Amino acid sequence: MSRRCDLTGKKANNAFAVSHSHRRTKRLQQVNLQNKRVWWPSGNRWVKLKLSTKAIKTLEVKGLEAMAKEAGINLNHY
């Protein structure tokens, strides 16, 4: 399974770890993903999604169906 948000598509970012002497080595900044069970009212059931914490906050404002429509995903497959 990929470390990617189901609704926003967020994934890891390439960055540098910078030491005190300013030597730079490559590292990954991972997305803060949470396995979340979300109630889907029109489907009348729970849906298990892997969401970033930013997506969870946005979900409370927009709602599940609006975000799924924007992402172009079919909730019947989850």
UniProtKB/Swiss-Prot annotation:
Q: Name one GO molecular function term.
A: structural constituent of ribosome
Q: Does the keyword Acetylation apply?
A: no
Q: Which InterPro entries match?
A: Ribosomal_bL28, Ribosomal_bL28/bL31-like_sf, Ribosomal_bL28_bact-type, Ribosomal_bL28_sf
* Listed GO biological process terms: translation
Any single Gene Ontology cellular-component annotation: ribonucleoprotein complex
Read off the NCBIfam families from this record: L28 (TIGR00009)
Report the sequence similarity comment from the record: Belongs to the bacterial ribosomal protein bL28 family.
The protein's name = Large ribosomal subunit protein bL28
